[in-house]
Amino acid sequence: MGATKFVLFIVEGETDELALGRALTSLFASGEHPGPRFGIVRGDITSVHALGAGNPASTIKRRLVDAVKEFLAKDKLRVTDLDAIVLLSDTDGAFIDDSLVIFDEDEPRCSYFEDRIETSNVASLRQRNQCKSSRLKTLSRTHELTCNKRKIPFKAAYMSRNLEHALSDCSGRVTQQKKYDLARKFSKKYGTDVIGFLELLTFLAPVGSYQDSWVYVARDNNSLLRGSNMKQTLEALPSSPIKAVSSL
């Protein structure tokens, strides 16, 4: 029998792992799969700031592979230890039409609503949306990454409009401390409640397959609405932990 493989989740920050780590570990364990590992890149690698405005969308694949290699080297693991790679990303309303990015001179950053984003820097936010949505579309059509000449199954999961909105129904601007508080609360509630966790993922999931979930979030203002395709992502993994659970 070969060595046990694990799923690597590439996430933006520590609160992603704090919120989802125990719940996902319990879910994987229910199907007798090893718990997932988390590689934290500390920032949105689909953004302009991470890759540069002039880089093509395909650059995101190279950045992802670099992040995987860094994680494996740090933990002294091999590519052959990977069962699959999952990128978890916030949508940040990136797929909305430019007309829904509204000027507000009193808003130094941006405020998110279900039907618009308000900001004092419209041009910059529209550019961010164009770059981020292009890269996410590329990833939604990517089904494997090549790392050290080995092809590893890949899926992209999204939280809409962000982790706090999707998991905790918190739609306002939150401080870093608030993010940690929400993540701890979520972990405490769902960390060992596999059925409850799956019920939430089912509630957040759009109708249809993994690919359908990306068609949905790219339509209209859906990337501003609360939702996630984590359920479809987990179902699409080679060793799906969801398929091992008999009931939802």
Language-model features: where?
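C-terminal accessory helical subdomains adjacent to catalytic cores in phosphodiester-
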Residues: G2-T4, L18, R22-S58, R62-L248
